[in-house]
Amino acid sequence: AFDGDGDRVGIIDEKGTYIPADKFMIMISRDLIPTHENKRILYDVKCSKALTDEITRLGGVPVLCRTGNSYTKLATRDENCIFGGEFSGHLYFRDKFLGFDSGMYAGLRMVELLSKTNKKTSELLEGVPKYYSTPEIKIPSTDTKKKEVVEKIKEYCHNEHFHTIELDGVRVEMEDGWALVRFSNTGPNI
């Protein structure tokens, strides 16, 4: 299925299960990393640990980027990544495509994967560990207040000596997972 302007694709497996974009990125990474010299794969701060773990396991180089279509598109090119994407489903192929997001092209790459592996969609994710996540929670705010709140959370995390990544809001890294608090770039939400 494609979104309204055709720049994203949603993948549904043969069992009727929706495949999130970061899982689709695992499928593509499994195809690209073993066969290309450039093994850099870009992902945004909302993607799961399963993706970064798989990129690393395959010998690839995970490259973290802030969330946002314009950021990930530019960073995929500027960081010289063969492939990049974000949790919202914008995907950028640079191995044999121009590097912009096209739902149609991403869908065709899925068809290509199915054809050359002769596997079912669900089988393309075999061996990926199950990580549990909460759905995105949006808290209404004002544009001014949302920035203040994220800054206060950053300050708290520093005071508590948490390991953080502050590329986009504050992502607290833990041994068995992470938590992210960021403000929306497109609306008055945290």
Residue ranges and their predicted role:
Residues 34-189:
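Phosphate-binding and adjacent anionic-ligand microenvironments
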